[in-house]
Amino acid sequence: MTATLERRENASLWGNFCDWITSTENRLYIGWFGVLMIPTLLTATSVFITAFIAAPPVDIDGIREPVSGSLLYGNNIISGAIIPTSAAIGLHFYPIWEAASIDEWLYNGGPYELIVLHFLLGVACYMGREWELSFRLGMRPWIAVAYSAPVAAATAVFLIYPIGQGSFSDGMPLGISGTFNFMIVFQAEHNILMHPFHMLGVAGVFGGSLFSAMHGSLVTSSLIRETTENESANAGYRFGQEEETYNIVAAHGYFGRLIFQYASFNNSRSLHFFLAAWPVVGIWFTALGISTMAFNLNGFNFNQSVVDSQGRVINTWADIINRANLGMEVMHERNAHNFPLDLAASIEAPSLNG
């Protein structure tokens, strides 16, 4: 009898815990994905803040020339970053217990790998939590689908690219100037500006910004006034009201006359789907582009491809970009190698017997 009561009490405790985790009445929804999301994101955030402030220099290139990234070692908010894990570690899983000491772990950039892996797991769980909450509320799953675009982009630069290049040292540093350094080096080594998937990503981001501004301004300009001239038009909206808050017919007519009739949506649902899908698809393509360039399937190369009838090269913008790429690559890891691979491959070592 005692055993039966104890089992019931345990089952009741577990049931109460499950109900609390999956309850949509909580101020913040937790969910089963949240059980993993909360500790991983807290770990990534706390280690990031600590390392950004106080981490010692990291031997990123594996040549015993540490690079400083923290505030206490001379950086500011702009120049500071979490330096990627050393090239000496490569793609090895490098938790604290794999190093001989904490000092060695810090010197080889262990915090970067810890932060990145916890962060990626955390944002993936956040996406799952969005789907879970939508499911429990009877909503459609498109919020999680939209969020998959930035998750894919983060996974591409922090995980897929290092895997393709063979080392976490090639991942994007966690800082402002480190991000720009990553972009410049990526252009130098992969010619990303000439990759069609990057072009689609640019169209997605800038186009999404344009469409968002157009939609917001059209709605704001065609509000149905519920207030007097002396009050703000925004004060006429009541949260949860059933009436339309703006006149879509007026907005449609305005935009149709401004451009042409069929450039304007007459269906609010299709309009908002388009506003969501355009930037999401663009960022998906960018993430796919980064993932292909990770394995050196690079952007188009039109170097010296335009020639006259005599075979002489007519320089184009592609050749200017190529020259800029070589210059950027020369500056990158200047102490790790003397020449970028493009130049080194074209220089034959002198023969001693020749």
From Swiss-Prot:
Site (Tyrosine radical intermediate): 161
Biological process terms in GO annotation: photosynthetic electron transport in photosystem II; response to herbicide
Free-text cofactor note: The D1/D2 heterodimer binds P680, chlorophylls that are the primary electron donor of PSII, and subsequent electron acceptors. It shares a non-heme iron and each subunit binds pheophytin, quinone, additional chlorophylls, carotenoids and lipids. D1 provides most of the ligands for the Mn4-Ca-O5 cluster of the oxygen-evolving complex (OEC). There is also a Cl(-1) ion associated with D1 and D2, which is required for oxygen evolution. The PSII complex binds additional chlorophylls, carotenoids and specific lipids.
One GO CC term on file: photosystem II
Amino-acid positions noted as binding chlorophyll a PD1 in the UniProt annotation, renumbered to this chain: 198
Post-translational modification: Tyr-161 forms a radical intermediate that is referred to as redox-active TyrZ, YZ or Y-Z. C-terminally processed by CTPA; processing is essential to allow assembly of the oxygen-evolving complex and thus photosynthetic growth.
Residues the entry annotates as binding a quinone: 215, 264-265
Reaction catalyzed: 2 a plastoquinone + 4 hnu + 2 H2O = 2 a plastoquinol + O2
Protein residues bound to pheophytin a: 126
Site entry: Cleavage: 344-345
Binding locations of Fe cation: 215, 272
HAMAP family: PSII_PsbA_D1
Other facts: 2 of the reaction center chlorophylls (ChlD1 and ChlD2) are entirely coordinated by water. Herbicides such as atrazine, BNT, diuron or ioxynil bind in the Q(B) binding site and block subsequent electron transfer.
Family, as annotated: Belongs to the reaction center PufL/M/PsbA/D family.
Protein name: Photosystem II protein D1
Organism the protein comes from: Selaginella uncinata
